[in-house]
């Protein structure tokens, strides 16, 4: 199966909600999460998918096909991997309120060092079998966003994200949206032609079926199933071919899971 995770940027809005704060390279050269405890102390460990999978594969190497781990679909507006690498943090222009607060709370913030640290983590991850895809720079709904806006958005991704994570030919659409119908992409699809011209060849949406794949001479298109708390709570039967939800559901999790 193809394993992916969206939005591994540790956005500002996630602060204080029990999420890790960033990915780091520890003293052993391994990629781990930094986690800020309630008392402000910092712990380092397996607190999100990337280090959890890395640790699991060490114990079960047959789980990984030719050393591959997964694909991370990345935006850029809040930076990447927990590092505040977008140009707005350097220029101080067009900042959102949470970005302003971050800079106010970190008067010693060093943009150049932040980018350097993010590159170090990305390099270590790629060496361990992780790959990166575009998730659009601004988490855009590609179906609802105009072509001109998507062009501006992709330009930002290539300018501010690609130098850190590397170039990619994969785009995993935010919101599970898509740029065409199930029938396939055609030459008169302007959004597809644009992304094709920018070097993208692998396109992923979200689909509830067990598998949805289209392969042509020009592109590979695949649906993804969201393995999250929402799907586990409301539609466990859709995941039954993968695992028994009752065996992995954490009983301490508050229910009902909020609707969408």
Q: Where would I find each of the regions flagged by the language model?
A:
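C-terminal active-site subregion of NodB/CE4 polysaccharide deacetylases
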Residues: 1-3, 10-15, 127, 142-260
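Metal-dependent polysaccharide deacetylase catalytic core of the NodB/CE4 family, i.e.
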Residues: 1, 9-180
């Amino acid at each position: 199966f193809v394993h992916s995770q969206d939005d591994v940027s540790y956005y500002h809005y996630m602060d204080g909600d029990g999420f890790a704060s960033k990915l780091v390279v520890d003293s052993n050269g391994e990629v781990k999460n930094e986690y800020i405890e309630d008392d402000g102390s910092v712990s380092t460990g397996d607190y999100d998918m990337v280090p959890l999978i890395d640790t699991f594969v060490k114990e079960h190497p047959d789980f990984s096909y030719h050393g591959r781990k997964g694909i991370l679909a990345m935006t850029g507006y809040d930076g990447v991997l927990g590092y505040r690498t977008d140009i707005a943090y350097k220029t101080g222009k067009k900042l959102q309120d949470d970005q302003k607060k971050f800079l106010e709370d970190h008067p010693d913030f060093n943009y150049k060092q932040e980018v350097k640290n993010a590159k170090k983590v990305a390099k270590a991850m790629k060496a361990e079998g992780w790959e990166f895809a575009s998730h659009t720079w601004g988490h855009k709904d590609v179906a609802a966003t105009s072509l001109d806006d998507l062009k501006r958005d992709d330009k930002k991704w290539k300018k501010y994200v690609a130098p850190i994570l590397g170039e990619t030919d994969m785009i995993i659409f935010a919101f599970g949206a898509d740029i065409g119908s199930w029938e396939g992409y055609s030459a008169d699809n302007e959004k597809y032609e644009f992304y094709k011209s920018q070097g993208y060849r692998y396109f992923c949406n979200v689909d509830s079926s067990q598998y949805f794949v289209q392969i042509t001479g020009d592109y590979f298109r695949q649906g993804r199933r969201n393995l999250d708390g929402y799907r586990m709570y409301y539609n466990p039967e859709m995941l039954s071919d993968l695992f028994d939800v009752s065996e992995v559901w954490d009983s301490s999790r508050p229910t009902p899971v909020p609707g969408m």
